């Protein structure tokens, strides 16, 4: 994809993203952020032309954190489109899934959750127990599912990404780049338009509890239609975002903001 330089709109978008990421990441304190300084990796793509409007350290390996769940959902959408499951298919929670670290829904071993609810749980609460439940029910084990995720990434052009789990919880071998995450986000938009709108979900109610999407852009930046936030201490604040303004459609990824 060609790089267009001097794209002021793209740079402004990155700055907005960086600010929103810093204020709205998943259960992370400003103190912990200040103690782990890093240079953010970023990329902005014009979705109408495929041109790269801005790129900084876009090929540098980073930890994806919960942006991992975009690939978990990409694989899930493939199962839905193939008719192997439906939105109402019930997934069974295993002890492994129930034991995942926060953030989570608090699913109990032996409980069941519908595919549609699991998908919304990933998008809003970034629920690690729901991610592991998807992985084990579709892949037999989370390890097997992670291999499918990596192989799927290679197929769509993610040349520097390796997945070891379905949630994005810390694993030194689970790496990606801003470019690869932009490729994944673009494929989610183009390949699964019938399912992509799940990323617009602002609120999700499950078992009587209401969850608010961690992506503050959905609430405060006009034209945002998704997609995902992520945070670990090792990764810093991560965000992939898709925004429509008039006839413009920009896709941006910031890793380590």
Task: Annotate each language-model stretch with its function.
Residues 158-162, 170-257:
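Domain-terminus/edge residues, biased toward the C-terminal soluble/receptor-binding domains
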Residues 10-20:
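Bacterial N-terminal signal peptides
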Residues 25-179, 189:
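Active-site-adjacent loops and short helices of periplasmic peptidoglycan-processing enzymes
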Residues 22, 136-137, 144-149, 194, ...:
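Contiguous hydrophobic segments
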Residues 2-8, 22-33, 39-41, 48-54, ...:
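Structured C-terminal helix/loop/strand segments within mature extracytoplasmic catalytic/sensor domains
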């Amino acid at each position: 994809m060609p790089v267009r330089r001097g794209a002021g709109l793209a740079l402004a978008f990155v700055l907005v993203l960086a600010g929103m990421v810093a204020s709205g990441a998943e259960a992370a304190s400003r103190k912990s952020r200040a103690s782990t300084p890093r240079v953010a990796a970023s990329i902005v793509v014009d979705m109408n032309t495929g041109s790269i409007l801005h790129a900084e350290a876009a090929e540098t390996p980073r930890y994806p954190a919960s942006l991992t769940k975009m690939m978990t959902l990409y694989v899930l959408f493939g199962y839905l489109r193939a008719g192997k499951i439906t939105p109402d298919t019930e997934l069974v929670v295993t002890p492994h899934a129930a034991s995942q670290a926060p953030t989570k829904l608090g699913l109990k071993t032996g409980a069941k959750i519908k595919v549609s609810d699991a998908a919304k749980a990933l998008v809003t609460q970034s629920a690690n127990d729901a991610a592991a439940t998807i992985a084990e029910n579709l892949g037999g084990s989370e390890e097997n599912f992670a291999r499918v995720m990596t192989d799927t990434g290679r197929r769509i052009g993610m040349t520097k990404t390796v997945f070891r789990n379905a949630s994005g919880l810390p694993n030194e071998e689970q790496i990606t780049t801003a470019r690869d995450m932009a490729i994944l986000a673009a494929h989610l938009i183009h390949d699964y338009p019938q399912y992509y709108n799940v990323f617009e979900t602002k609120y999700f109610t499950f078992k009587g509890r209401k969850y608010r999407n961690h992506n503050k852009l959905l609430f405060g930046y006009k034209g945002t239609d998704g997609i995902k936030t992520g945070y670990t201490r090792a990764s810093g604040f991560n965000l992939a975002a898709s925004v429509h303004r008039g006839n413009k459609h920009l896709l941006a990824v910031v890793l380590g903001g």
